[in-house]
A protein has these predicted regions:
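Rhodanese-like catalytic fold shared by cysteine-dependent sulfurtransferases
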Residues: 1-22, 28-60, 69-103
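Short, surface-exposed ligand- or partner-binding patches at beta-edge/loop junctions that are enriched
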Residues: 64
């Protein structure tokens, strides 16, 4: 299995630099209601196949869930469907909340 992980520091750097990217939050709505990264595109995991045509292919697509397990599967699915810039956010929203936005 190939590693398509991006650390939370890498995502924070993309955001700070203003680099084009999309954060794809694949958690369920009740999970997103607890904590979310600003400007995330929220599409539950089970709905991803129906939204492939609307997702950005030309810049990094960083997929996240709670800890990075579901998003790892989705990042691999996206890569297998032509999204060469799909990445799994290592540690998920949990790592983001602990290391980048602890408030």
């Amino acid at each position: 299995m190939v590693n398509y992980d991006m650390g939370v520091e890498g995502l924070a750097r993309l955001r700070a630099e203003g680099a084009a990217h999309t954060v794809l939050d694949i958690r369920e709505p009740q999970e997103v209601a607890i904590c979310v990264i600003a400007d995330s595109l929220c599409i539950p995991m089970q709905q991803i196949p129906q939204h492939l045509e609307s997702l950005e292919r030309d810049h990094p697509l960083v997929v996240l869930c709670h800890h990075g397990m579901r998003s790892d599967m989705v990042a691999e699915f996206l890569r297998n469907n032509g999204f060469e810039n799909a990445w799994n956010l290592d540690g998920g929203i949990d790592a983001w909340a602990r290391l980048i936005e602890p408030e």
